[in-house]
Curated annotation (Swiss-Prot):
Catalyzes the synthesis of alpha-ribazole-5'-phosphate from nicotinate mononucleotide (NAMN) and 5,6-dimethylbenzimidazole (DMB). The lineage of its organism: Bacteria, Pseudomonadati, Pseudomonadota, Alphaproteobacteria, Hyphomicrobiales. The gene is cobT. One of its GO terms (molecular function) is nicotinate-nucleotide-dimethylbenzimidazole phosphoribosyltransferase activity. It comes from Sinorhizobium fredii (strain NBRC 101917 / NGR234). GO terms for biological process: cobalamin biosynthetic process. This is Nicotinate-nucleotide--dimethylbenzimidazole phosphoribosyltransferase.
Amino acid sequence: MSASGLPFDDFRELLRNLPGPDAAALVAARERDAQLTKPPGALGRLEEIAFWLAAWTGRPPAVNRPLVAIFAGNHGVTRQGVTPFPSSVTAQMVENFAAGGAAINQICVTHDLGLKVFDLALDYPTGDITEEAALSERDCAATMAFGMEAIAGGTDLLCIGEMGIGNTTIAAAINLGLYGGTAEEWVGPGTGSEGEVLKRKIAAVERAVALHRDHLSDPLELMRRLGGREIAAMAGAILAARMQKVPVIIDGYVATAAAAILKAANPAALDHCLIGHVSGEPGHIRAIEKLGKTPLLALGMRLGEGTGAALAAGIVKAAAACHGGMATFAQAGVSNKD
């Protein structure tokens, strides 16, 4: 905690002093790319991904220790009947991750990705955002700090994902609080909300944003009022990655909402991040557009768990492999253009 005693102060200081890209590494990557055995631009976005890796790691593009970090939290707003599933499913899915039985486990095996799962006090749901703040400032800051531990032990590509019954309600409230519009524009089915459940979900988002409307101009305050533990932890992980020169792939609707908090605090806060995919959650494409990003994949997925980010990691690994492994024209004895 900072000397002033305010829990968010250290994070505000970090957000004011974000490191930028490594210009020399970027130039070196562009120069090598110009010598590879292909026409300029022939690998399309793969080339841009390689440059992005170089700029944010400060070295030639490589992915040797990719990691998927899943943050799991429970939410008091589920008491409003916003989801057909009970909150106990969150803990059950954490057990499924540990047993290797979830979709994310299979994708991690396929693409040789590490996996860490962070259980964020699942027995103690956050406050119901339609009635009170989700978290105290102290609890929110502590959870951000815990999320920063995602990169402890070393990784060179971090994929951010989540698990939490009720958290698409939270994501919709964050987006409505940040960007305005109507609740209907930001609320989608999540884990299968429809009919009366979907109506309750929309109403809950409206009530929550109305309750906290006088406190939403500060992004970190918005997060602690409308967010949740996995939101705070993901924000902390993304911020820590920036400070440690670790590129990040953001997953779906909920992870994007966490990222949006940081961008609202500093417009450059997500320059080291890619959006892995656009999900089937209706508000996600609008949220991505607000961030000024272009997703790598569009597969109609809306599972969460970091699955879209993990699939995108395979593309990022391929981009690095092409950049580092392809021969130059001189090495291959292939004639370059005149």
